[in-house]
From Swiss-Prot:
Name by which UniProt lists this protein: Anthranilate phosphoribosyltransferase
Subunit structure of this chain's protein: Homodimer.
List of residues binding 5-phospho-alpha-D-ribose 1-diphosphate: 79, 82-83, 87, 89-92, 107-115, 119
E.C. numbers: 2.4.2.18
Length: 334
């Protein structure tokens, strides 16, 4: 371990094999907290490579709890969080729209990072059981086509890393890793990040993790979702190739909405916002959900363009199919 830390101190990259070995030792309890903190800090100071991020994600995913399911076309739309936007639960709300549109949604998420309510908090407020065992979660997914996987329960190996992260108190490679280590073998993914400078590299990691198609998105002002208050940037992974794109609301036929109009509240308040959107009540929350669900349909390949995805999202919500998915999850994941 000392050799690894010394290498990072000299601003030298770790090989995939070196990173794999050190993370394996960490997640099996063989490395001291102080050394883990030094590793995280060294990687941050040097700058994390695609190879290092991929190796970390592959090891962490290998130690995740496995969800038994016959479904092989799962999708997630989890973001990194930490964007300090204090928005409502955009991706969680959009997940029900995507599921209502026929996509098998395995929503991976946690409690709040930068807002008052993370995906786990708002779903708990809606009566969703966060603590079902893996077999039960697999059954929920088979029965409903949507399931929520509480990251804290899915990744027991995180307990070895968390104390070092907390002691550092700064963003590290781990902040970028959560959406990459989904317990299932996802086919497609929409991943939000507050770091527009990492769109392409994150798409490369998703490619290395086996995604067939994906969109990595960063909204205006560092929002880790698509936004209607400025230019949204995204990387598209398609047919093994990665391309960079951006759009303004007017480019996709939508009106600009200020960030202040989509502020959220606590878990109970955000649950009420989620319900209002799924019940098709006109609001900035509805428009923002439609945008992100539309981008999700495009990321999945269900639509051929973002505009087509937006139209599909409106149709799914208006039909009641998205709200029906929430009711199914409340019935089966309880």
């Amino acid at each position: 371990m000392k050799e690894i830390i010394a290498k990072l101190a000299d601003f030298k990259d770790l090989s995939s094999a070196e990173m794999t070995d050190v993370i394996e030792r960490i997640v099996t309890g063989q490395v001291a907290e102080s050394q883990i903190a030094a590793l995280l800090l060294g990687l941050k100071m040097k700058g994390e490579t695609i190879e290092e991020r991929t190796a970390l994600a592959q090891v962490m995913r290998g130690h995740a709890k496995q969800i038994p399911t016959t479904i092989r076309t799962a999708m997630d739309n989890c973001g990194t969080g930490g964007d300090k936007s204090f928005s409502f639960n955009i991706s969680t709300t959009a997940a029900f729209v995507l599921a209502g549109g026929g996509i098998k949604m395995a929503k991976h998420g946690n409690r709040s990072i930068s807002s008052k309510s993370g995906s786990a908090d708002v779903l708990e407020a809606l009566g969703i059981n966060l603590d079902l065992d893996a077999t039960s979660l697999g059954k929920v997914f088979e029965q409903t086509g949507i399931v929520f996987l509480f990251a804290k329960n899915m990744h027991p190996a995180m307990k070895y890393i968390m104390p070092a992260r907390l002691s550092l108190g700064i963003p590290t490679i781990m902040n970028l890793t959560g959406p990459l280590i989904h317990p299932m073998n996802l086919e497609t993914q929409l991943l939000g990040t507050s770091r527009p400078d990492m769109l392409e590299s994150t798409a490369e990691v998703l490619k290395n993790m086996g995604r067939k198609r994906a969109v990595v998105v960063s909204g205006p002002d560092g929002l880790d979702e698509a936004g209607l208050h400025g230019r949204t940037q995204y990387a598209l992974l398609e047919n093994g190739q990665i391309s960079l794109h951006s759009f303004l609301p007017s480019d996709i036929g939508m009106k600009e909405i200020p960030l202040e109009a989509i502020r959220g509240g606590n878990a109970k308040e955000n649950a009420e916002i989620l319900l209002s959107v799924l019940q098709n009540q006109a609001s900035p929350y509805l428009e923002t959900t439609v945008l992100n669900a539309g981008l999700g349909f495009y990321a999945n390949g269900k639509s051929d363009s973002i505009e087509e995805g937006i139209a599909l999202a409106r149709q799914v919500i208006a039909s009641g199919a998205a709200y029906e998915k929430l009711k199914q999850l409340q019935e089966y994941q309880k």
